[in-house]
């Protein structure tokens, strides 16, 4: 009897072991064909619809909240840079980098200081420039002159949005 229990255990284990343990567990016929690009950590992954790894890039930085695969196969990735500790907000980033297909950093740029900080997203443009979404420090006086209700100011400052267009130059500069 022990022998039959053993045989049953071996066969049932082998059947369970055949279930998928890695990748996509549900595939819907209405799923768009293509790839998924995501950066959950210092690494960025490109996977197919079955969850198979197509490519991977490594970074020295924690991720910001956006990543783009560019037409030439390079990767535009936002980075979380919090070394200034001036402003802490949801979606804080502070930097961006472009990596080639082999993972070499070909351009890296920080857009953060005590008066401005990149956050959430960037947008690569067809001309090679990048739109950058950022917060910009306004003093209470500046904010009130621009129409802010003084009763709604916290810490006597305001961090409104601004968007700039930058042109990557060299390996770590921008116009």
Regions found by a protein language model. Give the residues of each.
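Bacterial Sec-dependent N-terminal signal peptides
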Residues: 1-20
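Histidine-/acidic-rich catalytic cores in large beta-rich domains
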Residues: 18-175
């Amino acid at each position: 009897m022990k022998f039959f229990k053993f045989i049953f255990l071996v066969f049932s284990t082998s059947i369970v072991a055949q279930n998928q343990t890695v990748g996509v567990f549900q595939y819907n016929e209405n799923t768009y064909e293509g790839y998924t690009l995501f950066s959950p950590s210092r690494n960025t992954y490109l996977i197919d619809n079955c969850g198979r790894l197509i490519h991977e890039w490594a970074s020295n930085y924690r991720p910001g909240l956006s990543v783009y695969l560019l037409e030439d196969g390079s990767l535009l990735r936002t980075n979380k840079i919090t070394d200034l500790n001036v402003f802490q907000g949801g979606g804080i980033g502070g930097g961006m980098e472009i990596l080639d297909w082999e993972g070499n950093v070909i351009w890296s740029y920080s857009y953060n200081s005590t008066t401005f900080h990149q956050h959430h997203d960037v947008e690569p443009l067809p001309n090679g420039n990048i739109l950058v979404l950022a917060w910009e420090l306004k003093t209470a006086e500046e904010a009130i002159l621009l129409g802010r209700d003084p009763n709604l100011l916290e810490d006597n400052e305001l961090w409104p949005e601004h968007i700039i267009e930058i042109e990557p130059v060299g390996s770590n500069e921008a116009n």
